A protein has these predicted regions:
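C-terminal helical/tail subdomains of lipid-metabolizing enzymes
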Residues: 2-6, 12, 236, 288-290, ...
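Patatin-like phospholipase
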Residues: 13-35, 40-48, 53-149, 181, ...
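Active-site periphery "cap/insert" segments of enzyme catalytic domains
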Residues: 140-171, 182
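Eukaryote-biased recognition of electropositive, low-complexity segments
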Residues: 241, 245-246, 259, 268-271, ...
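Extended hydrophobic secondary-structure segments that form protein cores and membrane-embedded regions
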Residues: 46-48, 78-82, 169-172, 229-232, ...
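Short coil/turn segments at secondary-structure boundaries
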Residues: 117-121, 155-161, 209-215
Length: 497
């Protein structure tokens, strides 16, 4: 019988003094401490990694270019990341090389999360009892192994990390109990273990059990008021702003004791603009998007910023087949656009409904060839077309009936409107992924500002999406190279003359 990993869904947020770190001479891979002596003309001191699931592997290529340019690790003093980006932020906060990242981060990142026993049934039982299908112990242990290799302690705290590695690490997490984003950092949670915060930020709802934190005082009194934490990407998927303003500033003038006075007006500081402004020009942020995603930062791509040639892998071939379908749909868009315009012009009574005579007038006014009509409707017979669209059997066609018919012909009008393709969830994990992306995309769109463009490197992962798992080495090398090309293109475009 498979042994169930021990439950890590309940953890203690200790306010006690953490254990002392072992001598640096005893660690396996000594950290590289920043000294500002990197040979580069670029001003960057902060890195911010967006969440993105399987797309995150591209960050290895991005970090590799920063190494070549002399930016990382010697000049980087502050690092932040959300969801999968929090793991890369943790690695970068240690100052380890991109080669070390490539060696230690498993090819199948998803395997770190799926450690529940009992198959699908066991997962559903755990989801019902513990709010997650997998305990997340394997991920928690992996993070601890890395931290122990480089710092000497699997449970190194944010304060100790700053002391040993010389960098501030900030990890956004979602507090479900308070329904807000919190930032784990030396200023806010100095005695929290780094791997606890990283595990929280990677806690995809449903897939992984949430982390429940309570203070020493709560544990002593026995009060059941622990707070639940899940994936930071739910509310803060793009953390480029984290080192803006004063909220996470360690300057004594920005202490909470000073900034939060008077307490009766502290609520006025909740809006992002009140805490995270002005923008910090020393921050370099990274975003990720697949080829089918319409990301706001796609329009920020610099010349030469494009993915490499696709490898001949199963994931790439599957995506190519989907592209063919989308191309056929795209070929239909222009004649359909003309159809909608002409239907509006022939709507004599302006009631938004289409009568049989109005449809006949539209298709016979010379705007459409017989080929266009067949392409859209599959036939050129007006009566047959009307009956196909007239789902309720009435005298007119409602606009909703027209849209429903067009969708049966392969045109997703909703996708054309919002810019994101439909992605029907195949299981509960896909459902959770769609849910978190729906929220994070909307928030990212509303929070992205013009200040972010000159400090953001958009990375296209082409055929690799957030949930494109079971990748082979050729896929991973493709993403590393894509991250490298996009980062190099950005730096070349912003290089000082």
């Amino acid at each position: 019988v498979a042994r169930e990993p021990k439950d890590t869904s309940i953890m203690l947020l200790s306010n006690a003094e953490p254990r002392d770190l072992p001598p640096l001479s005893s660690v396996k891979v000594p950290p590289v401490v920043p000294n500002g002596q990197g040979r580069t003309s670029f001003p960057y001191e902060n890195l911010a990694f967006e969440g993105g699931g399987a797309k995150g592997y591209a960050y290895i290529g991005a970090v590799r270019v920063l190494e070549e340019e002399g930016i990382y690790p010697l000049n980087i003093r502050r690092v932040t990341g959300t969801s999968i980006g929090s793991m890369f932020a943790m690695f970068a906060s240690l100052g380890v090389s991109s080669a070390y990242m490539e060696e230690r981060i498993p090819a199948d990142i998803e395997s770190l999360a799926k450690d529940g026993s009992g198959g699908a049934l066991g997962g559903f039982i755990r989801a019902a009892r513990r709010k997650g299908m997998n305990p997340g112990q394997r991920l928690y242990d992996f993070l601890g192994e890395i931290l122990e290799e480089v710092t000497g302690s699997a449970d190194i705290t944010f304060a100790q990390l700053h002391e040993r590695c010389g960098r501030e690490l900030a990890i956004p997490v979602t507090n479900v109990t308070r329904m807000m984003t919190e930032f784990c950092h030396i200023k806010t949670t100095p005695n929290m273990a780094v791997r606890v915060a990283t595990r929280m930020s990677m806690s995809l709802p449903v897939l992984l059990q949430p982390i429940s934190l309570r203070s020493v005082y709560d544990r002593v009194t026995g009060e059941a008021n622990a707070e639940l934490y899940v994936d930071g990407g739910l509310l803060c998927n793009n953390p480029t702003h984290v080192f803006d303003g004063w909220w996470l500033s360690t300057d004594p003038r920005d202490s909470f004791l000073r900034r939060l006075q008077p307490l009766d007006r502290a609520s006025a500081l909740y809006p992002r603009s009140a805490r995270f402004s002005p923008a910090n020009p020393r921050t370099l942020g990274f975003t990720l998007f697949a080829g089918e995603e319409t990301d706001i930062t796609r329009s920020w791509l610099e010349p030469g910023a494009e993915p490499p040639a696709r490898p001949d892998t199963e994931a790439a071939r599957e995506y190519a087949e989907k592209e063919k379908v989308r191309q056929r749909q795209s070929d239909m868009q222009r004649p359909i656009q003309r159809l909608l315009q002409r239907l509006d012009e022939h709507d004599v009574d302006s009631d938004g409904r289409i009568s049989r005579d109005e449809l006949r007038a539209t298709l016979s006014d010379g705007s459409f060839s017989a080929q266009d009509t067949v392409l859209i409707f599959g036939t050129s017979d007006v009566d047959e077309i009307f009956e196909h669209m007239n789902a309720d059997g009435g005298d007119t066609i409602e606009f909703g009936e027209l849209l429903s018919f067009l969708e049966t012909r392969g045109l997703d009008v909703t996708t054309s409107l919002v810019g994101f393709p439909a992605r029907p969830p195949k299981n509960i994990v896909d459902f959770a992924m769609n849910l978190i992306e729906a929220v994070s995309r909307d928030l990212t769109r509303s929070n992205q500002t013009g200040d972010d463009r000159p400090r953001t490197i958009p990375i296209s992962t082409d055929y690799v999406g957030t949930t494109t798992f079971n990748l082979v080495d050729a896929d991973l090398q493709f993403m590393i190279e894509s991250g490298r090309k996009h980062t190099k293109a950005f730096l070349d475009a912003h290089r000082a003359d």
